Amino acid sequence: MKGMIIVNVDKCNACKSCEIACAVEHSVSKDLYQAIHEDPTPRARVSVQQGVSFSVPLQCRQCANAPCIALCPTDALYRADPDSPVLLDEEKCIGCNWCVLACPFGVIYLDEERKVVFKCDQCFQRVQRGELPACVSACPTGALMFKMLEEIPKERRNAYLVEIAECLTGGGV
């Protein structure tokens, strides 16, 4: 059951609803009004990056041979099974930053306050319950979609990754 969060940069208006939904989903209370008072404050695992003519929500791309997993000295980053997203065991994380440096997309972050990293887990528990990731559910324009890999032709997957890479390096869109 390998899924992927797909971004249509033409539909993203940088409203950041995905960021808010993500932070709330990863809060203790799961409620916006309570989450803003939690300590530590919940953090979004998706970040909307704005270019000159486009915006793109960025989150973990769930690399097949994830360098973050390979470099983690404590095995805090792992896959529950071969088809699961890259997950984080915060109890094992020592905040060494190796995964942050290794991530080719720059989407693993260090929580300075707690001295542990945080990253997108594709709302693994929500997806297991048959729900969409919080960012996808919250997107008012449909710029974010969650698709199973078998639903996406290989050519489209490759074209999508090239498109995102071009956006990140200043080319394209």
Where are these regions (language model features)?
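Aromatic-flanked redox-active Cys/Sec active sites in thiol-based oxidoreductases
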Residues: 9, 74, 90
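N-terminal beta-strand motif that seeds the catalytic metal site of vicinal oxygen chelate
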Residues: 1-10
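N-terminal signal-anchor transmembrane alpha helix
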Residues: 13, 17-23
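Flanking helices and flexible, charged tails adjoining ferredoxin-like Fe-S electron-transfer domains
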Residues: 2, 28-62, 69-70, 90-92, ...
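Ordered, amphipathic secondary-structure segments that act as subunit-interaction surfaces
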Residues: 62-80, 84-85
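Residues that cap or initiate secondary-structure elements
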Residues: 11-13, 126
